[in-house]
């Protein structure tokens, strides 16, 4: 019996799943961030070691990493996996979005909106992507972009902020004092990650019709829809019917995000018949499918 291990290594957390040939779950583990670009090396290795603690000896391993952006980072990812498990096995490293796409094989396009954002799909047997440039150069419609709007609204208009937003900020930062909040963002190992934790507040406030939140949802979902439209025009121009799988924490935070996204997407590409659903299986299962390909010689 072979043991297949998949890892979903993101900017907020890392998860490990081991399964056998029959699809039985043998192990699940979780720890902190494991982004190959933004997570410090020592912390990344400790987090993966903690997430994999107790995992049975693997035969085939695939780690899907945020921050895997070059052949060099791929090789680094493979080396980290080899060190983490410390046993003879077959290893591969792929970008984190590949796991989400493989977890939803029935979808034409996967739109990921978590801490960051990215659009990916299959085209002529290859996986193609748009976006994914990080919170400084992109991440349209990401948890970071909404969380930043939420915190900025509070800092600029604390007296007009809802009780829900105030509670969420205090839960994340432990204070409502401006100096503590600003310091907390800039001293965070990943500013994007800590700000993304405020996305639920934006969804809640948008549902209540609070202006800053409704404007934030409309603006960022318009940008994300425009990114998807560019992806479709370039990679799926002849398609008049497309299915989209929505992955990431933003879609779980509130129905407001999906509703606004669909409105703007239809405005961008009115000729396309859209079918849209939340990712039905966690990306971890896609990572396991990628590990299985190692056994099939793909």
Predicted regions and their residues:
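Conserved phosphate-binding catalytic cores of ATP/NTP-utilizing and phosphoryl-transfer enzymes
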Residues: 1, 88-111, 125-126, 236
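ATP-binding/phosphotransfer module of carbohydrate and carboxylate kinases, centering on a glycine-rich
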Residues: 1-57, 103-109, 151-298
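Short, glycine/acidic-enriched loop or turn micro-motifs at the edges of active sites
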Residues: 11, 99, 117
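Short beta-strand-loop/turn "lid" adjacent to the catalytic site in phosphate-handling enzymes
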Residues: 36, 53-92, 243
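Glycine-rich beta-strand-to-loop/alpha-helix junction loops that act as flexible
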Residues: 62-69, 113-116, 242-252
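Short, conserved acidic/polar surface loops in the N-terminal third of protein domains
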Residues: 72-76, 102-106, 121-124, 257
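Glycine/charged-rich beta-loop-alpha catalytic/anionic-binding loops adjacent to active sites
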Residues: 82-86, 92, 127-134, 266-275
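Glycine-rich phosphate-binding loop of actin/hexokinase-like ATP-binding domains
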Residues: 106-157
